[in-house]
Amino acid sequence: MAVDNFKPTLWEGALIANFHSVSIADVLATPPADIKGNKVIFNRIAGGTLKDYEGSVDWDEIDTTPVEMIFDKKKYFAFALDDVDKVQLKADVMTATTKEHAAVLAETYDKDFFAALLAGTKLLIGSSSAKKKVTPLNAYDYIVDLGTQLSKKKVPKVNRFVTVNADYLGLLSKDKRFTDNPKVLENGVVEGQVINGMQVMCSEELPANVVIANHKSAIGAAKQINEMEAMRLQSKFADGIRGLCVYGDKVLREDASAALYFEVGTAADVDPINVKITNDTKNPVNTKEVAGA
């Protein structure tokens, strides 16, 4: 029977590889230091200490605080194939199958990731009830402000990201300080675009009307594919493949992320530019007489 030749590691590897290529959360989060069963451990390092030198040296122990996370979210997939053997031998069919399921899994994983990150964010510009009006003239500036919020908390300069949705990316594209033709890679990276030290990312899995800036140390995330198996289906003449994905996320540093609540403004929200011209002896306006006028 075809299912006797099923190779679970082959499918798991293909699924995870495709997942990594499309999940934005994997780029933004800290990976776990250790995974034991359904428990994940992240190590948070305490701040360093400087002392005045007076002829002797006192040694400090490196202090790490283990932060535990349980895989509290579980999703499964199950699909039927006419012949598992044939699909495993045809790389294009297997790639398409695993890529599609990896994309669906990544969407759910990223959506939960951003919801957790926002819930743990304390540095806010605007609020859910008082959103900032954003136009092409100030969209870039608000992202600069998010980066400034992180800098004021002394968040490390490297591994900073800011994630926007397609609407916000469109507003940025109309600002001369940004590119007018942004290229979004498969994993959400907006190629070559950095604002105030933050790599610009794009995702539609963000909470509505929110832009989030974060350092990788702000949140940890992990997932596992469990129970990958094949079986002969009784209800149809086909083989079935199913798998269970368990995952979770944990906010590690509340001061390492900042969020903007916004709504897209209209032309009426753009501040008018008033130019006042005076023409007197102190501030004369140079004019030129036109012959025959």
Specify the residue positions occupied by each region the protein language model found.
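Sequence/fold signature of self-assembling virion shell proteins
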Residues: 2-50, 60-78, 134, 175-293
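Long, contiguous amphipathic alpha-helices that act as assembly "spine/axial" helices in icosahedral shell
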Residues: 42, 64-124, 153-155, 159-162, ...
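Residues that scaffold the ATP/ADP-binding catalytic core of kinase and kinase-like folds
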Residues: 52-53, 172
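Short, polar loop/linker segments at the starts of domains and inter-domain junctions
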Residues: 54-60, 101
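Residue-level detector of alpha-helical recognition elements and their boundaries
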Residues: 57, 115-116, 256
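Alpha-helical scaffold segments that mediate packing/assembly in large oligomeric complexes
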Residues: 84-152, 261-280, 284, 289-292
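Short, catalytically relevant binding-site loops at active-site mouths
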Residues: 118-119, 167-171, 207, 293
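Extended, solvent-exposed, turn-rich assembly/linker loops in the middle of proteins
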Residues: 122-191
